[in-house]
UniProtKB/Swiss-Prot annotation:
Gene (name only): trpC
Protein name per Swiss-Prot or TrEMBL: Indole-3-glycerol phosphate synthase
Keywords: Amino-acid biosynthesis, Aromatic amino acid biosynthesis, Decarboxylase, Lyase, Tryptophan biosynthesis
Keyword Lyase: yes
Origin species: Acetivibrio thermocellus (strain ATCC 27405 / DSM 1237 / JCM 9322 / NBRC 103400 / NCIMB 10682 / NRRL B-4536 / VPI 7372) (Clostridium thermocellum)
EC number(s) from the headed UniProt entry: 4.1.1.48
Source lineage: Bacteria, Bacillati, Bacillota, Clostridia, Eubacteriales
Amino acid sequence: MILDEIVAQKKIQLKKDMSRITIEGWKQKIKRPGIHKPLDFYGALKNNGDISIIAEVKKASPSKGIIKEDFDPLKIAKEYVESDIQAISVLTERNFFKGDEDYLVKIRQFCPLPILRKDFIIDLWQIYESRYIGADAILLIVSLLSDEELKKFQIVANILGMQCLVEVHDERELERALESGARIIGINNRDLRTFEVDLKNTEKLMNRIPNDRVVVSESGIKDTEDLKYLKELGVDAVLIGETFMRARSISEKIREFKAV
């Protein structure tokens, strides 16, 4: 399964990365003056008064290959900022999504919006790294973590001032996310094991989530009809990547979506 391959590669990459700096090393770096103070990701999505948009900087995916050939992460992020969306998601996974931590570092330098680090986080080391490179929130995928890890990772992220988008795909994962105390729940409409997409997954899980949580619908949002459907369901936010990456004009596509 592709998810198993991604995690296996992530473990190999992490072993190399962790050999150059320890968690203690990250802790010291985080204390340096001038390090970005995390923004309120939850507040940006919940208090918008309308459905919020998290726009993603995404070059490729395992299911689609290269999505955007003329990929300029800084230009894309600037267009997002100018389009008055609520948050930006930056893919940093290198092997399968062609992302890079450096994209986030550079976008952080000019971006006034909360930034979500989208990666496969399986070790505390990555959480400290995320804080140092400028993330305001991190993605935690429930299916990759034990109950203990899910709770501990959120606690550590919160202590560091960051928030977590806790991603689920089915009822059991949602139950685990809620039990862990997750405040921002991402419902992935894509099954990460088969890569099949069904927007109705959001509808199926939504009514099980308390009103004080932020609900984010992720994957498969292609047009204004999809957005209208999700808005009528009452989701707080949508995470959109591929649709914006394939658009002839990102800003025009966002304008269309915001008019819904």
